[in-house]
Amino acid sequence: MTYKYLFDTNIVSHIMQGNDEKLLKNIAAVTVGQAAMSSVSFAELEYGLNKFGKADALRQALQSIMLRVDVLPWTQSVAACYGELCSNLEKKGINLSNFDMMIAAHAISMDII
C-alpha cells in the first residue's frame, strides 16, 4: 500500500484529545489507506496511556484512530535509513531525540510526508 501521510506521535495525541477542531477537520478529510503511523509512535502512545492513568477514554480514542490509520512495522530498511540519517545530522551538529529520529527515518525510507 502507498501511504501519503505518516502521523507523528504528537499529531495522534492531539487527535486523541479532540481539542483542536481545525486538526480534526483536516484529519477527517484524509481517506482511509492514505495515513499511517510508525510502530515507534504507537509504542510512545501506549507508554503514555499506561503511564498517566487516563487510559480508558484515551485508549478508546486511539482505537478509533486505528480504524483509519495503519501501524507500520520497523524493518531492516528503516533501520538502515535511521543509521544514515543520524550520522548525517550528527555531522551537521543536529541532535534530535532517538524516537523522533526513528519516526523521521520511517517517513524518509517510505517516501511519506
Report residues per predicted region.
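Short, well-structured N-terminal submotif of metal-dependent ribonuclease cores
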Residues: 1-37, 49-64
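Nucleotide phosphate-binding site architecture
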Residues: 12-13, 43-46, 72
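A generic structural signal for alpha->beta connector loops
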Residues: 32-34, 68, 111
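Generic structural signal for small/hydrophobic residues in well-ordered secondary structure
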Residues: 8-9, 23, 45, 82, ...
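Generic alpha-helical structural context detector
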Residues: 14, 47, 80-84
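Active-site neighborhoods of divalent-metal-dependent phosphate/nucleic-acid chemistry enzymes
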Residues: 3, 70-113
